[in-house]
From Swiss-Prot:
Protein name: Transaldolase
Gene Ontology terms describing biological process: carbohydrate metabolic process; pentose-phosphate shunt, non-oxidative branch
Any Pfam family the entry gives: TAL_FSA
Cellular component terms per the entry's GO annotation: cytosol
Assembly and interaction partners: Homodimer.
Iron is among the record's keywords: no
Length: 322
């Protein structure tokens, strides 16, 4: 008797499955369409044998280009390692590698644009075309405006840390390629306040992503909705059918081991093609300020990303000095 397909196999028929990791071996094993890299993952890569040659090469570059401006050298090595890891990952996946712009640029439109262009140029030097890369940017007003310009230049963007409808709609209106609403972090906020949902259908993160997905489809938006930051397979299963789902290796493994039925939960609705009303900076700020959860989680998310980047830079500094 033929075994029934795993839930991971069934999910792949409903949504594009993305690996929320830069773990080379996990990506080889789990075969996602897309994957990601960020400072935390690059820092972990410093200890993985598969990246040893890349790391030694870039550290040697850093030692040779030390000069007087040590911080600039450290930052450049961090960029080179990020793109180097991304280049290796691009050879494993048929789709895209998301590459994160420095979180400390989250409120600087022009600096975000400059860093994105730099990453794309660095990838090109390594033989990776821009259609293999998504530039990951925090969904502040300034980040969304940077993405608007980058999209016009043909550089596709992944706007991350989406917690609020105005963030999502502003991204769609700006023509952003993809948004990443954070399911688990939304749930975390309410659970911390003693508001644990009675069922998965009442999970505030699941409800939010379903709402954004339905509105985008109804309005005919081409912006891809990629659910992110999952705390359980139940959250993932509740969003089966979403455009894309980015999932950690441990949850991918659990889905792969489960051979139960996985029904579709999200489907494109009949579009009424009602245009998304442009959102200006004032209404965006007002909406965000009125949403305690989004305000807290966007700020803490940026802060966490910035601390991760600083930890990577410190590790590089230590290795350059060693």
């Amino acid at each position: 008797m033929t075994a029934s397909p795993s839930k991971l196999a069934q999910l792949r028929d409903l949504s594009v499955v993305v690996a929320d990791t830069g773990d080379y071996d996990a990506i080889k094993r789990l075969k996602p369409v897309d994957c990601t890299t960020n400072p935390t993952l690059v820092k972990k890569a410093l200890d993985l044998p598969v990246y040893a040659d890349l790391i030694e090469r870039e550290l040697a570059w850093g030692r040779a280009h030390g000069g007087e401006d040590r911080n600039s050298t450290i930052n450049e090595v961090a960029d080179r390692l990020t793109v180097g890891v991304g280049t290796m990952l691009s050879e494993l996946v048929p789709g895209r590698v998301s590459t994160e712009v420095d979180a400390d640029l989250a409120h600087d439109t022009q600096a975000t644009i400059a860093k994105a262009r730099k990453f794309i140029a660095m990838y090109a030097e390594r033989g990776v075309s821009k259609d293999k890369i998504l530039i990951k940017i925090a969904a502040t007003w300034e980040g969304i405006e940077a993405a608007r310009q980058l999209q016009q230049e043909g550089i596709d963007c992944n706007l991350t840390l989406i917690f609020n409808r105005s963030q999502a709609l502003a991204c769609a209106e700006a023509g952003v390629f993809l948004i990443s609403p954070f399911v688990g972090r939304i749930l975390d906020f309410f659970v911390a306040k003693g508001q644990t949902p009675a069922s998965i259908d009442e999970d505030p993160g699941v409800v939010f992503v379903r709402g954004v997905y339905d509105e985008f489809k109804r309005r005919g938006s081409s912006t891809v909705v990629m659910g992110a930051s999952f705390r359980s397979t139940a959250q993932i299963e509740a969003l089966a059918g979403c455009d894309r789902l980015t999932i950690s290796p441990d949850l991918l493994e659990k889905l792969d081991a489960d051979h139960g039925d996985l029904p579709r939960k999200l489907s494109p609705l009949n579009a009424d093609n009602a245009a998304i009303t442009p959102i200006n900076s004032d209404s965006f700020a007002t909406d965000l300020a009125a949403d305690d959860m989004a305000t807290e989680k966007l700020a803490s998310g940026i802060d966490t990303f910035a601390k991760d980047l600083e930890a990577l830079r410190k590790t590089i500094a230590d290795k350059l000095a060693g």
